[in-house]
Amino acid sequence: MAAVNIIKKRTKPFKRHQSDRFKRVGESWRKPRGIDSCVRRRFRGTISMPKIGYGNNKKTRYCMPNGLKAFLVRNVSDVELLLMHNKTYAAEIAGNVSARKRVEIVEKARALGVKVTNAGAKVRSQE
């Protein structure tokens, strides 16, 4: 079976109607429900609404450009969960993990053959 290319149908975020005009209207998407709304009635030239057709392929959904899915790791025992799934998932070390624990996690991942996406983050070289 041939590998499926990762194609994102839309990378631009859906913004709320008139969020660029008024400060009080936030950017996070809300469905327009007004009776005269041009966006709800899908007039030409208005912003597009999220719909099922923008969904990505199920096989490549949540995939990073390298083809792996990110798995959040908080301790060394979490890395061992990826031992059987190292071709599907890549470890991503959580932001609240200390530098000392990060070194242990990266060493364990290297021994198990698990890819770490942010291996160099918060780790200083010995001077």
Curated annotation (Swiss-Prot):
Function, as annotated, reads: Component of the ribosome, a large ribonucleoprotein complex responsible for the synthesis of proteins in the cell. The small ribosomal subunit (SSU) binds messenger RNAs (mRNAs) and translates the encoded message by selecting cognate aminoacyl-transfer RNA (tRNA) molecules. The large subunit (LSU) contains the ribosomal catalytic site termed the peptidyl transferase center (PTC), which catalyzes the formation of peptide bonds, thereby polymerizing the amino acids delivered by tRNAs into a polypeptide chain.
Kindly list the places in or outside the cell where this protein is found, as annotated in its UniProt entry: Cytoplasm; Nucleus
Q: Name one GO biological process term.
A: cytoplasmic translation
Q: Which residues carry this modification: Phosphoserine?
A: S77
Q: What else is known?
A: There are 2 genes for eL32 in S.pombe.
| Superkingdom as given in the UniProt entry | Eukaryota
Any idea what this protein is called?
Large ribosomal subunit protein eL32A
PROSITE patterns in the record, alphabetically?
A: RIBOSOMAL_L32E (PS00580)
Keyword Nucleus on this protein?
Answer: yes
Q: How does it assemble?
A: Component of the large ribosomal subunit (LSU). Mature yeast ribosomes consist of a small (40S) and a large (60S) subunit. The 40S small subunit contains 1 molecule of ribosomal RNA (18S rRNA) and at least 33 different proteins. The large 60S subunit contains 3 rRNA molecules (25S, 5.8S and 5S rRNA) and at least 46 different proteins.
GO CC term (a single one) = preribosome
Task: List the InterPro entries hit by this protein, alphabetically.
Answer: Ribosomal_eL32 (IPR001515), Ribosomal_eL32_CS (IPR018263), Ribosomal_eL32_sf (IPR036351)
The terms under GO molecular function for this entry are: structural constituent of ribosome
Instruction: List, alphabetically, the Pfam families matched.
Output: Ribosomal_L32e (PF01655)
**Keywords tagged on the record:** Cytoplasm, Nucleus, Phosphoprotein, Ribonucleoprotein, Ribosomal protein
The gene is rpl3202
